From Swiss-Prot:
GO terms for molecular function: ion channel inhibitor activity; toxin activity. Residues 1-19 form the signal peptide. The keyword Signal applies. Expressed by the venom duct. Keywords: Disulfide bond, Ion channel impairing toxin, Knottin, Secreted, Signal, Toxin. GO terms for cellular component: extracellular region. This is Conotoxin Vc6.13. Belongs to the conotoxin O2 superfamily. Residues 20-44 form a propeptide. It is found in: Secreted. InterPro entries: Conotoxin. It comes from the Eukaryota. Its main location: secreted.
């Protein structure tokens, strides 16, 4: 009877350790994923400025230096357009 009790205690400890390791691994995975930028965001941002059709609010955010208050334009249009 004593051997069975010890065996059950050892099994419970091993299962607890396994569950703890899995939980820590999941947390590490979540932290890693939360630090990454979305692929679309990485693609649209280049050298600190937004490429064509990146979301913007002012000209200086765009590589083309031309924001139409919503998206970056491919190039700045001449005055009067």
């Amino acid at each position: 009877m004593e051997k069975l009790t010890i065996l059950l205690l050892v099994a419970a400890v091993l299962m607890s350790i396994q569950a703890l390791n899995q939980e820590q691994h999941q947390r590490a995975k979540i932290n890693l994923l939360s630090k990454r930028k979305a692929p679309a965001e990485r693609w649209w941002r280049w050298g600190g400025c937004l490429l064509w059709f990146g979301r913007c609010t002012k000209d200086s955010e765009c590589c083309s230096d031309s924001c139409d208050r919503t998206y970056c334009e491919l190039a700045r249009f001449p005055e009067g357009w």
